[in-house]
């Protein structure tokens, strides 16, 4: 009897250890994805939501078999650095970097953790990869490079009397610098006059907008994070001067721009999420994953803004009015 009791105790102890071991392995198997987002605005939020949905659609759900740590830097470089340091010290399994400054921050902290980016215009110019075809770094992802020439063509169709086009952008954002250069070429190729005003932060946006409306018949805004967050400010100035504003993406149009032919950022984020699934499943590594781009572009026209500035939308564009 005594031997039987001892056997039961020993068997119980073994079972406890086995169960504890299984629990430990289960906890260890839950991979952590850190999301570092540069700033909060419609486009970047949509990209994040699309990314998470793609994971969920493929069986990766936050709190179940993965852990997602989402951090927003609120357009602050010191916040970006702090968040990046935290992700590295916590040894997360993967990072989603939303917008160029976020990707540059985390990529500058680690060469080991896989990084996927989204809402990034030019990975090569941002020094995140060696080439779009074969990154050869721990970074890959999706690009939000716009059809800039076609956006300038849209401006001309909506504002045919425009002679001078002003481009407003943030001089500290590599993605905006690249887009401004492309826009300049497209504008001048049409025989129009190009002018520009730059800002370094959101506090300068109102004054910069007041400056550019004095010399431009219409304004072009690239996909610029500072400007996307300050669209209501830009709208407040341009609606008074009745200056049309063509934007780089639909979220900017929804918040006060006139029109765009732009990317669906939710779809872009979703595509990035599908890339993440490949990495999580060990089927691919960022170093050999080509940068992917949007599969299509959508027209979006803000009818309320058109009415406010007295602009008549051509009949062949009325189907694209979103509000």
Language-model region placement:
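Pocket-lining segment of extracytoplasmic ligand-binding domains
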Residues: 168, 174-249
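Hydrophobic alpha-helical segments within soluble ligand-binding/sensing domains
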Residues: 123-164, 263-284
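Extracytoplasmic "Venus flytrap"
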Residues: 33-52, 58, 69-78, 172-176, ...
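Beta-alpha junction/loop-to-helix N-cap segments that form part of ligand/metal-binding clefts
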Residues: 73-130, 221-248
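Hinge/cleft segment of the Venus flytrap/periplasmic-binding protein
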Residues: 278-323
């Amino acid at each position: 009897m005594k031997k039987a009791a001892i056997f039961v105790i020993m068997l119980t102890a073994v079972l406890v250890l086995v169960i504890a071991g299984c629990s430990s392995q289960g906890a260890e198997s839950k991979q952590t994805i850190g999301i570092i987002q540069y700033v909060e605005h419609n486009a970047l939020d949509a990209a994040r939501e699309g990314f998470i949905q793609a994971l969920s659609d493929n069986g990766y759900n936050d709190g179940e078999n993965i852990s997602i740590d989402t951090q927003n830097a609120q357009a602050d470089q010191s916040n970006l650095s702090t968040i990046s340091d935290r992700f590295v010290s916590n040894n997360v399994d993967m990072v989603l970097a939303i917008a160029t400054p976020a990707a540059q921050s985390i990529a500058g902290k680690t060469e080991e953790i896989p990084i996927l980016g989204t809402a990034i215009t030019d990975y090569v110019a941002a020094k995140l990869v060696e080439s779009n075809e074969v990154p050869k770094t721990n970074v890959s992802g999706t690009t939000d490079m716009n059809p800039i020439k076609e956006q300038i063509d849209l401006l001309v169709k909506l504002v045919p009397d425009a002679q001078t086009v002003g481009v407003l952008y943030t001089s500290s954002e590599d993605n905006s610098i690249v887009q401004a250069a492309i826009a300049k070429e497209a504008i001048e190729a049409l025989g129009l006059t190009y002018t520009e005003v730059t800002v370094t932060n959101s506090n300068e946006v109102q004054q910069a907008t007041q400056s550019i409306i004095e010399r431009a018949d219409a304004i072009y805004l690239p996909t610029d994070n500072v400007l996307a967050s300050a669209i209501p400010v830009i709208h407040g100035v341009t609606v008074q001067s009745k200056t049309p504003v063509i934007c780089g993406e639909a979220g900017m149009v929804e918040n006060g721009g006139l029109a765009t032919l732009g990317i669906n950022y939710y779809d872009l984020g979703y595509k990035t999420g599908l890339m993440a699934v490949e990495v999580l499943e060990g089927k691919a590594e960022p170093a050999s994953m080509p940068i992917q781009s949007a599969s299509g572009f959508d027209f979006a026209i803000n009818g309320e803004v058109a009415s406010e500035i007295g602009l008549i939308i051509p009949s062949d564009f009325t189907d694209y009015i979103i509000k």
